[in-house]
Amino acid sequence: MDALCEANGTFAINLLKMLGEEDHLRNVFFSPLSLSSVLTMVLMGAKGNTAAQMSQALCLNESGDVHRGFQSLLREVSTSGPKCLLRTANRLFGEKTCDFLPAFKESCQKFYQADLEELSFAEDTEECRKHINDWVMEKTDGKISEILGAGTVSPLTKLVLVNAIYFKGKWNEQFDRKHTRGMPFKTNQEKKTVQMMFKQAKFKMGHVEEVPAQVLELPYVGAELSMLILLPDENTDLAVVEKALTYEKFRTWTSPEKLTEEKVQVFLPRLKLEASYDLEAFLRSLGMTDAFEEAKADFSGMSAKKNVPMSKVAHKCFVEVNEEGTEAAGATAVVRNSRCCRMEPKFCADHPFLFFIRHRETNSILFCGRFSSP
């Protein structure tokens, strides 16, 4: 599973950097685990060059038995309890007139716990779209209401793959609401007032000399999941950190031996972000081109009609960070047709930063984002 987690992590950092390149002032938030799992499920039905390109884009070239690995990984990261909930759910929605191969359907159920629900896109496109959106809304506790926008499916749609991931966690050390107050958040362009939370407690913290930047780990109750924040030093632009960042460096910078537990004053803004992406262009730039072209797409491992290209890869994510903890939801739909010399160290996130929600045991990045504009 280590090779798979490394592949997923590399894909996560690659996509984070690409999504951020378009506009350095734009907030970014997505679930790489959600994306990797749904695209790898599609990969089961891909053959030839289509499969090779998908494997390369997903960094899966040396990951062994990928689907068995995902079976274990998805089981490992799913956790629940009164104070921490993480759920992943997969489903295939297929045109009822299509002849999907039994082996493909069985593999989706076996490795991704994904059922195939047959719908009639040809006869009632809009009703099918609403049905899929309702399923995602249910699986994300209403946080994601419309993964498929108007016009994203058509009478020609043959297969929609949907993966929903939902997380709600409480901080192990909760912030006290009475200490939250308005404070300036500094971007390159201006200052904006944010509701800044405050907590003084023992946290794991480190400093990256190379960039330079601070690293802070905020664990959730149960300690299986934690939020990692990568905050550039006061006079360092976040773009410098993003340019230097690779998955290998992320793993090094956030490794237990690089972080020291100490009493620290933490200032963290309340966050509430919602982001939507059409990822076709980004996946194409990662070399995954044949899957989107009817003349080249080879999904003969999925259906007798192999030349049925993907027509849309939609991803929508929601995150809320407050004094109690974090609520995050992500859904993907694929439509086919420390260093501190002070006595009391301070971690003050009053300027743009990167953040990650990580499963500690497997080192898997479940969500990642950039907060640069309140």
UniProtKB/Swiss-Prot annotation:
Disulfide bonds: none annotated. One of its GO terms (molecular function) is serine-type endopeptidase inhibitor activity. SUPFAM superfamilies: Serpins. Keywords: Cytoplasm, Protease inhibitor, Serine protease inhibitor. The keyword Cytoplasm applies. The record marks R339, C340 as: Reactive bond. Its main location: cytoplasm. GO terms for cellular component: cytoplasm; extracellular space. It is found in: Cytoplasm. CDD domains: serpinB8_CAP-2 (cd19567). Has an important role in epithelial desmosome-mediated cell-cell adhesion. Belongs to the serpin family. Ov-serpin subfamily. This is Serpin B8. The gene is SERPINB8.
